[in-house]
Amino acid sequence: PISGNIYVKGRKISDFTSKEYAKTMSVVLTEKIKTEMMTCRDVVAMGRYPYTNYFGRLTKEDEVIVNESLKKVSALDIAENDFSQISDGQRQRIMLARAICQKPEVIVLDEPTSFLDIRHKIELLDILQEMAVKDNVAVIVSLHEIELAAKIADYVMCVGADGKIEFGRPEKIFTDDRISSLYGLIHGTYNCMYGSTELKKPEGT
């Protein structure tokens, strides 16, 4: 069972109002959202709703932030496209732009590199690093790709199949023995020097 509390700046998030929560934290999930006749720009603009008035109208400043968010994920060229008709990789970039548009203090992303080709994967990780360093945003990312986590994370938390948890700096957690033990590697090993798993050589070679 899940228990405990989550605090942001010393305050439990369960005490936040819905608007306070939306201004503080944004979330990017892998599951697809269904939209009816919405352009990519419309979806990104949803990130500004916590800041709008009772009528939900966007100001000129909001429109500028929407454009900046689209530009940051290299999606200005598809801004007027129907969101339901774009590719999975493009959807991922638009959903990231929506999260950026919220101007959050914390952003949580569930496997954000899924569906992305190598170019857009690198661009996305670069954006997240920039948000963390320049904008002082706390970036929490779930990844299956250990090699990516080793390169971009300040701290990592690894969860094994048995629920065992390892937490710390990547260089302390991503060691051959720890990764092999945590994930029960039998048919291969983890090479901490290259940040990758390696198969055992076939017998007789």
Question: What positions do the PLM features span?
Answer:
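Conserved ABC transporter NBD signature motif
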Residues: 4-12, 21
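Conserved ABC ATPase "signature" region
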Residues: 45, 60-78
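Conserved ABC ATPase signature
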Residues: 82-86, 90
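H-loop (His-switch) and adjacent beta-strand-loop-beta switch element
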Residues: 156-169
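ABC ATPase nucleotide-binding domains
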Residues: 177, 181-205
